[in-house]
């Protein structure tokens, strides 16, 4: 990678040193002792005159530079560390302890749990422990297999590595499988539901954003921006919203239904198989549309089965 760039890392280091030095000189002239003291000092900023530039002369920053009255007792910068309440997450309260034998000794773990939409990034902390111990290789397939029932919160299964399998009977919010890194995610409607899965939204927007490896099976329709920047996962879904497979560079996506507008915009790699393809919805700037050949049909059968 470095061969593609000219210069040396030391050049960047020198640049940052010079920026810091110049900043200190400016602060000294203003009588400011630290960067923290600069926070909120709108009185030190003014709009530079650009009368000789037609476009810039029409820019008015008065509202941006307006200095509202703030009582002295109110802090104008970071004062209190944000409490992310990690100890209340499903991973910290249950899953890490439950999956400890798998993480430490690679012993298979099977469990079934209820989930609701306040349970966010479920599986991510467990996955981070797996990656910390075993690196990119992860665990043997299905070492950790967790079945959930309910409505999952945002980022369900985000970044989970190889060896983790999450199965959800229910639905999920946005960012499902974000950054998937080798794991497997399966989502299907409640077994008692009476609606048609291929006609109803089961997953929110931006599912599998930036996913690099793994597999996903969604028995339902997903929202917008599905598999954006996918570079290696294999996903089967029954329909998706606008901007599907945007900037995709690798992997496979099988759509057993309809697609939304602007499909495959900026897609430079990978394969997408679409059952009900309206060519008007496909951005053909970088992709080629063609009927499935025998090899494609064989692969599609493998994915469906």
State each model region's role.
Residues 34, 55, 60-61:
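Short, solvent-exposed coil/turn linker segments
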Residues 41-57:
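Short glycine/threonine-rich loop-to-helix capping motif typified by GTGT followed
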Residues 1-33, 39-40, 63-305:
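Long, distal/terminal scaffolding or interaction modules
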């Amino acid at each position: 990678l470095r061969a593609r760039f000219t210069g040396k890392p030391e050049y960047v280091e020198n640049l940052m040193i010079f920026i810091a030095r110049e900043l200190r000189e400016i602060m000294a002239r203003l009588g400011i002792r630290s960067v923290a003291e600069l926070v909120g000092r709108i009185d030190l900023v003014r709009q530079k005159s650009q009368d000789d530039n037609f476009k810039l002369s029409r820019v008015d920053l008065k509202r941006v530079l307006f200095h509202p009255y703030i009582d002295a007792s109110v802090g104008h910068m970071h004062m209190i560390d944000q409490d992310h309440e990690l100890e209340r997450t499903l991973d910290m309260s249950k899953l890490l302890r439950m999956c400890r034998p798998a993480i430490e000794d690679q012993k298979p773990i099977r469990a079934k749990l209820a989930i609701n939409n306040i349970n966010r990034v479920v599986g991510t902390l467990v996955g981070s422990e797996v990656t910390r111990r075993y690196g990119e290789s992860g665990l043997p397939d299905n070492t950790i297999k967790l079945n959930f029932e309910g409505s999952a919160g945002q980022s369900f299964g985000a970044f989970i590595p190889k060896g983790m399998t999450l199965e959800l009977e229910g639905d999920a919010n946005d960012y499902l499988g974000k950054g998937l890194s080798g794991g497997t995610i399966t989502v299907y409607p409640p077994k008692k539901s009476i609606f048609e899965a291929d006609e109803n939204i089961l997953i929110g927007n931006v599912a599998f954003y930036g996913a690099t490896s793994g597999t996903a099976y969604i028995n339902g329709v997903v929202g917008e921006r599905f598999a954006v920047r996918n570079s290696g996962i294999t996903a089967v879904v029954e329909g998706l919203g606008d901007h599907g497979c945007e900037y995709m560079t690798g992997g496979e996506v099988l759509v057993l239904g309809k697609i939304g507008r602007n499909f495959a915009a900026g897609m430079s790699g990978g394969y997408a198989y679409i059952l009900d393809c309206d060519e008007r919805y496909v951005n053909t700037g970088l992709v080629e549309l063609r009927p499935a050949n025998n090899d494609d049909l064989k692969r599609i059968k493998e994915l469906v089965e």
